[in-house]
A protein has these predicted regions:
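Single conserved hydrophobic/aromatic residue that forms the stacking wall/gate
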Residues: 168-176
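Residue-level signature of mid-helix packing/kink "hotspots" within the transmembrane helices
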Residues: 40, 68-76, 160-161
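Cytosolic juxtamembrane N-terminal segment immediately preceding the first transmembrane helix
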Residues: 2-37
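Extracytoplasmic
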Residues: 23-57
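Small-residue-rich segments within alpha-helical transmembrane domains of MFS-like 12-TM solute carriers
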Residues: 36, 40, 106, 122-130, ...
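Conserved MFS/SLC helix-loop-helix module at the cytosolic interface between two early adjacent transmembrane helices
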Residues: 73-111
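Cytoplasmic helix-loop-helix junction between adjacent transmembrane helices
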Residues: 117-155
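Short hydrophobic/alpha-helical segments at membrane-entry points of transmembrane helices
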Residues: 110-118
Length: 176
């Protein structure tokens, strides 16, 4: 007979912890999916941005570079922020701030109005990976982390499918 059979409270608490683990993972995956969705849509929007505003590929390349450089700098900083303030807080702040930066980017009609919020979005996007990884490592044992990180990264891949699907739907259903 194992301890869980002789002590029913242990089995119940183990079971409820397991449910909490999966809830945390699904919440982190959902959040990370939308972090990636906020990044992926820019690439799909480039032809429309070029057509509407007359930006060159060079302009849009600089905007993408600003986002990626800010993202890289943010990766170096934000893991420490997650250690200091907690992964959940930092990841949540990043999601909200990235949403705001994406919203601001949507109003851009000049190159400077595009590159600034998109670059800032890169930093806010970097608030997703390291804090989410901290959450996962705090909740899951070392033996389970490979599977769990695989699921976490799978959410990023799903973002590409979601982004492309949403763009296709909006392109085929818009009235103009």
């Amino acid at each position: 007979m194992n301890r869980a059979q002789t002590m029913p409270g242990i089995a119940a608490s183990t079971s409820s912890f397991r449910v909490a683990q999966w809830r945390m993972l699904l919440a982190a995956m959902f959040c990370y999916l939308f972090f990636y969705t906020g990044r992926q849509t820019f690439g799909f929007a480039i032809p429309g941005i070029q057509a509407e505003f007359g930006f060159t590929k060079e302009h849009l390349g600089w905007a993408s570079a600003a986002m990626l450089w800010a993202y890289a700098i943010g990766q170096a900083i934000n893991g420490n922020l997650a250690d200091k303030f907690g992964g959940r807080r930092i990841m949540t702040a990043g999601a909200v701030l990235s949403c705001a930066a994406n919203w601001l980017t949507s109003f851009a009609s000049s190159f400077s109005a595009l590159i600034l919020p998109w670059g800032i979005n890169g930093y806010f996007q970097a608030l997703g990976w390291a804090p989410g990884s901290r959450l996962i490592s705090n909740w899951w044992s070392t033996g389970e982390r490979g599977k769990v990180y695989g699921l976490y990264v799978f959410a990023a891949g799903c973002a590409s499918v979601l982004s492309l699907s949403l763009i296709h739907i909006s392109e085929t259903t818009r009235p103009y």
